[in-house]
Amino acid sequence: MTQDSVTIKLDQFLKWVGAVNTGGEAKLLIQDGEVLVNGAVETRRGRKLGVGDVVRVRGQSYEVAEDGEA
């Protein structure tokens, strides 16, 4: 993923990095305010993430990186 490329939705990103097993699990964590994006609680599962965004869930941090790396 590059700065000018397509973004990824928060719930999809959580599944992609293995933080959750299902979209339903992602939805519940996000709705319950257990997911932070760049240090702020995010309750929109459709929030679009771009390169450099940092997602924190269940004590783990994941940074959106270029070329499909997390």
Please state what every model-predicted region is.
Residues 45-70:
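C-terminal structural segments of small proteins and small subunits
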